[in-house]
Amino acid sequence: MAMSLPQLGGAGGAHTQPSLPSLPAHLQSDTHLTAHLASRFHVSHPTARLSSHALISLNTYTNSSKGPDGGKEGSAMAGAEDIADRAFLRLGHRSENQAIVFLGESGAGKSTIRAHLLTALLNKSSTPLSTKLSLAAYVFDSLTTTKTATTPTASKSGLFYELQYDTSATTNPILIGGKLLDHRLERSRIADVPTGERNFHVLYYLLAGTSEAEKSHLGLDGGSGAAGTTQKRWKYLGHPTQLKVGINDAEGFQVFKNALRKLEFPRAEIAEICQILASILHIGQLEFETTSQTSVTGDDSGGFSHEGGTTVTAVKNKDVLSIVAAFLGVSSADLQTTLGYKTKMIHRERVTVMLDPNGARAHAGELARTLYSLLVAWILETINQRLCAPEESIANTVSIVDFPGFCQQTPTGSALDQLLNNAATESIYNLTLQNFFDRKADMLESEEVSVAATSYFDNSDAVRGILKPGNGLLSILDDQTRRNRTDMQFLEALRRRFDGKNAAIEVGSAQAKLPGSNFLTENTSACFTVKHFAGEVDYPVKGLIEENSEVISGDLLNMINGTKSEFVARLFGQDALQTVTHPTERTTVMQATVSSKPMRAPSVMSRKTTRAGRPSTAHRRQQQEALEELDRESQVGESNKKNANMTPEQGASGQFLASLDNLQKAVTDPGTNSYFIFCLKPNDRRIANQFDSKCVRMQVQTFGIAEISQRLRSADFSLFLPFGEFLGLTDSETILVGSERERAEMVIEEKQWPQNEVRVGATGVFLSERCWMEIAQLGEAVSVGGRYGGLHSSDAGDGLTPAESIPYGVSKENLVSGGNTPLMYGEKSKGGYFTDDNRSEAGVSAFGGGDMFKNLDTREQMAERGNEKSLEEVEEYRDKPSRKRWVALVYFLTWFIPDFAVRVIGRMSRKDVRMAWREKVAINMLIWLMCAVAAFFMVGFPMLICPKQYVYSSGELSSYDGEKGSKGAYVAIRGFVIDLENFIPNHYPGSDLVSETTLMKYAGKDITSLFPVQVSALCQGKDGAIPPEVTLDNRNTNMTGQPQLLAQRDVDVNSVYHDFRYGTNDSRPDWYFEQMYTFKHVYLKGRMGYTPKYVEKLARDSAWNIVTIHGKVYDMTKYMQGGLRMKTKPGEATPNIPGATDFMEDSVVQLFRSAKGQDVSKYWDNIKLSAVKKQRMETCLNNLFYIGDSDTRNSTRCQFAEYFILAISVLLASILVFKFLAALQFGGKNVPENLDKFVMCMIPAYTEDEDSLRRAIDSLSRMKYDDKRKLLVVVCDGMIIGQGNDRPTPRIVLDILGVSETVDPEPLSFEALGEGMKQHNMGKIYSGLYEVQGHIVPFMVIVKVGKPSEVARPGNRGKRDSQMVLMRFLNRVHYNLAMSPMELEMYHQIRNIIGVNPTFYEYLFQIDADTVVAPDSATRMISAFIDDTRLIACCGETALTNAKGSFITMIQVYEYWISHNLSKAFESLFGSVTCLPGCFSMYRIRAAETGKPLFVSKEIVEDYSTIRVDTLHMKNLLHLGEDRYLTTLLLKYHGKYKTKYLYSAQAWTIAPDSWAVFLSQRRRWINSTVHNLVELIPLAELCGFCCFSMRFVVFVDLLSTIVQPVIVMYIVYLIYQVASNPSVVPITAFLLLGAIYGLQAIIFILRRKWEMVGWMIMYIAAIPVFSFGLPLYSFWHMDDFNWGNTRVIAGESGKKIVVSDEGKFDPNSIPRKKWEEYQAELWETQTQTARDDVRSEISGYSYATKAQGPFSDYHGGYQPSRPGSTAGFGHPNMSRMSLAHSEMPGNRASQFGGSQFFSPEEMVGMPSDDALLAEIRDILKTADLMTVTKKGIKQELERRFNVPLDAKRAYINSATEALLSGQL
């Protein structure tokens, strides 16, 4: 039969033919079809048809709603509406589910056509629900669409949009609901935006569309512009140019907000959504740096790596951190800590990794991805809850399937996203091929209809290889992820599966040869290749396993668990977050994943009976049964969600595979009619109206369009109608004869339909959709223009708003926006998703005010709420009286600082923190008071006792004679010393009259005679006036200091130049006064000085009338000897005035005469003169008779001041001398004899690297001490991977010691130091023998692993807790107290495995993990203990291994050396070394004679294990200097014992090499020193005598520590004094300074430590740092702690209540039992067979934590701890022999498998041990014991329980053996 396909294109050229199958056969090739598409494209016909249910659409990159004539006809929009009309028609008339599937590459316009299609479908509904469904689609696109290199609207999530209809009552379906199913959002884009692309559009909407007030609240206001742009670069928004790409983000945000509001999201929720989006942007802005954690935490005792702080990663921009924390409802500190750590499961162990900045950046990215994924899931699920109809009411659905296009290369670098995306496209393409080629093949065959075969490219190999359940690629990836396999193991699994078995998948090599190498190494670029239908793609395997697991670390979940934000709690509480809980503590979330599949399954057809009159056929029944099966699977999926934590979890690939399977079943279901829309892009450059034939031809070839077209030319069947149904649709009443088949053939012959559209089968007719519409009389609805469309129902005129008025953008019409297009798509006035909704906009108008956060909590309030902790009362106590007195003193000293200021300005909300700050201020005030007192005694006290005098004796004056080498040129005039040298240049009248040489001859002399005075001008006499003729002779002093009266003839010849008295021709009465005024104020250097003895001598021997009045010396000798005369001008007669020359009062003259040579101040004060006369006399004395001041520089008072300071200096110097003598310990290091004492060697380990740990362990092991008598004890503080390490510290230690990973002992409970519930910790015990360089040393490793509920840093409690583990154990051993389960295991391991009774150990040798000890160190220390039984502890000399590491380490070398060899050696003289460093010390555990516990005595253990550390003093004692405090406790409670320093015992440690760590370490040391010395001073037991008691030395040390800054300032002051006044050299001070370092130099010279010369110079240069900068910094940062969450509040009646957010610890939660009781029970439960001993079930379970209660009484869920011995195991480098005969019967060698931390997929859903045991018993009852095997029993159990039991294999085997042997 010739094919005559209808020519519906109308008249015209070839381009008028829209149907490709209608083209001639010779035009059915790829090339010809492409040419045909091009011809249509160039005349603005961008669409073509393959059949009635397949459309081809070319993206024009212009308006997709305009056809060739400018109208809608012929456009892509019209084509989409045509498909919508057809689907709606079949939905109503046949009650079939409809599916519209989109295919096409990215940029082909799928999103645009989908928008038009959805609009057309929704326009057919008259309910307001259509608006909501349209808005839901917009919200989905906003959240999942981005701009890529190929399109501005690239969808990055698979969409299954289901419209739900009720078709039971009418042929016009009623829209009753909708459902959005998202498939695998491209999460990698969130934190890694590809270059030239954008992140998801909603993030740009937020930045551009918020108002200024909203931006301020969200923290987005940094440099924002008016047009929605910003100068600030946002990491998660890509390059700043992506903010301006022609998309109107601002309008998009308004539409997004309004869409949410119309979807009934409350205003508060919309605001919360915006806050989460903003927090994601801010997370991208976080900057990280490596720093040292110098603030000690509440749980951390510090102490590791010399207490310099742990290297951590911190956030640099704390302001951004606070914004994120506020929006998430958590504290900033918690968020920073969480981002710096990451908890993982490694080898079934929960381990915390300390991240570097890059790791922290990635962790922050994980948080951002998690937040966005959960937000999208929550929004979509919320929409679904409000739009989805009940399942029972849904009759049929229309489903739109649109997945991202095929991805040849992944822009984000995520191989997983690329693989899953391409897997989806592969699956969709395959179901497309099935629909066209295979779907009806079986039915055609059964109906005996033959159709010509058509060859086509079949991608079934690729589909099976990728998607086959069980052994497809995605299934293998999921399985390998569940099994914690590596990437290379995954690659090998693929090789085993696909090599030679599937041509579509090729697996690369896991090994490769590097260039220039002949050896195979791991191939870092290993990959596998998949031959997709669209091309080959190489997928790298590196990181694929980890990416597939998509694990959200427990750290983030633990942090979010404490959120104060209800919205954030809801996000993390939804079903999309699949949590993995601990097998024993269901409340403990170990980790989680965000689901990669939809939270809902596709809906199914309602089970209601079909409408009356509708035929019910076998086909319909088959369809119904298939849908029921799908419904059951859907219900199972819903049920599985509720029990997610009880079933093994899938990885991303497994979940995605399951969702694809659901989708494929829904689309390919027999009751579903599918339409396909092929979207093609005309060119790769997004150029409008340009057709690239090569580009299009490649797409035509890829999608097999030519083969599909050829297939449709032979078979285009869309329906099968049984003859009865077919005839019922036709007008066949006129045909009265013939069978149904004959009548049907007659109808078909009459219609003259082409053969490819209709065929008659055995029981019915196959029809195309066109033929069905014609026969059903629906063809009249076909619109003009030749398209199968416009089939609007009779309800089309329902008054709905037409699509042209719906505001959703030309987006979906114009994919390349040519300007500032609104939204992300286009103009508001064009067609799209939205229809008008006439409901009130009142709810939306709430946003009109420009601030959606108005009346909501501010960011500050959120931050404050996030920082609040949920506290619980844990303890109640009263303050001690001493504490009360101290608090009173603190408030007395800081009363002027209001509490409000401390709280607001200092931002200290907690009262205990404010109190600590006040204490710090008070302590600083006291310190500065002491410094001020010290400074006063050094400088102020001498000046107060002996004020400085600027006086010169005659001899001193003569030394200033101006000669070469002299100090200057001074002269004296009437008692005033003048600087002649400076005056000479200003001498008038200059050198012409008197030369400078002549003037310099006066230097060093008294030149009073050169300056005659006018008496009347300087003195008023008795009556107020003296005749001007009165003159007075002058007196000089010679250079020998002897006074001499000069006769008139001895008057200096130059005096005439200064003689302006009345009797001269040039009389100037005031000339002398004016000249002296200038001298005194410009050139004065001091005054002449006369000692009291010298004054007395002058009066006695020379008959001088000289006295001292108030420190001034006056001489009236000349006056009293008649030295006054009258001198008139030449030619004038001398007047006769009686008494003119006696102008002084007689009483004054008499005073000089009667008391000459004496101090007459008292007489002067009591002289009987009126005040006026006395004032006149005093003026006359000062002007005429003053010759100098009284010189008291050598007085008794001044001598006392000088010698008082000297005495103190000598006292301090004597201490230095004693220190020097103490350091002079000469003689060789005598090698002690071999000793037989047992010693424990303890190493606390935290995050040290392997080299440091190995050096420390090896140095202890290689010590020259009997190996059998030393025990290595390594305490690992938590499961933490330090920065730079690849394994957790415990694993590093165990690897060093040779412990195999298969050894996995049970974690056991013990008491720890921590807040609240952290006092309950758990640990594992390992033991064995360590062999190194011929030494075989027993060891015990204690690993603190933490409780199952601990997520972050499990087990970590600090160094002090590590010490307490051993101290508390030994304390209970020696006092025979009840022990915790872990301590019982320690006892067992030491006694029964190592073979030594724990009580035998006498000494505890403690070093740090970065310390290396000398081979003879322990021997020398123990020898000292044996020699002196009163010695309780000692330390050795610690040097530096990294001395030349940096300048910071260099300045410490000499300080380390001298602090040991001076300070500690001196303290050792008194037997009271006040600080035994924890890095290298040995302690006596018990007294040698009596066995009395010493180091582990009750008092020391109780005080050292103090948990309530809530005051500044206690924090400085226990958190800063626990080593020093431990020494303080030894001196306090064992005062009769000694602590010593042994210089012969040596060790080497690592000093801080960075300034921050060094500063932190010294802050710890200085502050702990101050607080510990305060503790020591009151002790009465400190030994000594007189001043040289230890108490005095302690006080001196305390004082010197405090006043160090003043000492440095004093040295600077001395240097200044010497520099400013070279004549004054403080010889004593410099002698003392010289003695200090001179004696030190003698020490290292005598010891031939020549290198110390250089180190000492560097140390001296750094004195300002050590003695000034560090103390000041330390004192002020005394309260620099992380105060934790425990605080103290005021209670009733003066009581204090301790509250904590860690919960209240119940001591009874840790069972305890004495060793004897435990041992007896152990004997009872052990068989009498001679086997090796292990822990009993009683020890392991009865005394383990109560959390294990739900498990079986028999062996629980954990395995007992295994001994380290190789007996029965054979592990290398482990126990090969027992050190002593075991006292216990043998070892059952850990029969019962398991571990503390099972991998989640193995443990959840497992049967209990009781159930397994019962079934094993039942199996063995009926089994043939001669043939039964363990494997067979396991298989039978798996069959019975229907779960794999690999994780229980060990238990099954051991239980089987126990039952067979009769043990059970």
UniProtKB/Swiss-Prot annotation:
Entry-linked Pfam families: Chitin_synth_2, Cyt-b5, DEK_C, Myosin_head
Annotated DEK-C domain residues: 1806-1861
InterPro entries named among the record's database cross-references: Chitin_synth, Cyt_B5-like_heme/steroid-bd, Cyt_B5-like_heme/steroid_sf, DEK_C, Kinesin_motor_dom_sf, Myosin_head_motor_dom-like, MYSc_Myo17, Nucleotide-diphossugar_trans
Entry keyword set: Actin-binding, ATP-binding, Cell membrane, Glycoprotein, Glycosyltransferase, Membrane, Motor protein, Myosin, Nucleotide-binding, Transferase, Transmembrane, Transmembrane helix
Location of the region described as Actin-binding in the Swiss-Prot/TrEMBL record: 660-684
Predominant place of localization: membrane
EC supergroup of this enzyme: transferase
Basic and acidic residues bias (residue ranges): 632-641
Disruption phenotype: Reduces mycelia growth rate, fails to produce perithecia, and shows drastically reduced virulence on barley heads.
Myosin motor domain boundaries: 1-780
Residue intervals of the Cytochrome b5 heme-binding domain: 949-1011
Bilayer-spanning residue ranges: 886-906, 925-945, 1204-1224, 1592-1612, 1625-1645, 1652-1672
Induction remarks: Exhibits higher expression levels in hyphae than in germinating conidia. Expression is increased in the absence of chitin synthase CHS2.
Known catalytic reactions: [(1->4)-N-acetyl-beta-D-glucosaminyl](n) + UDP-N-acetyl-alpha-D-glucosamine = [(1->4)-N-acetyl-beta-D-glucosaminyl](n+1) + UDP + H(+)
Role played: Polymerizes chitin, a structural polymer of the cell wall and septum, by transferring the sugar moiety of UDP-GlcNAc to the non-reducing end of the growing chitin polymer. Shows additive effects in septum formation with CHS1, CHS2, CHS3, CHS4, CHS6 and CHS7. Indispensable for perithecia formation and regulates conidiation. Plays an important role in the response to cell wall stress. Also required for hyphal growth and pathogenicity.
Name used for this protein in its record: Chitin synthase 5
Organism (species): Gibberella zeae (strain ATCC MYA-4620 / CBS 123657 / FGSC 9075 / NRRL 31084 / PH-1)
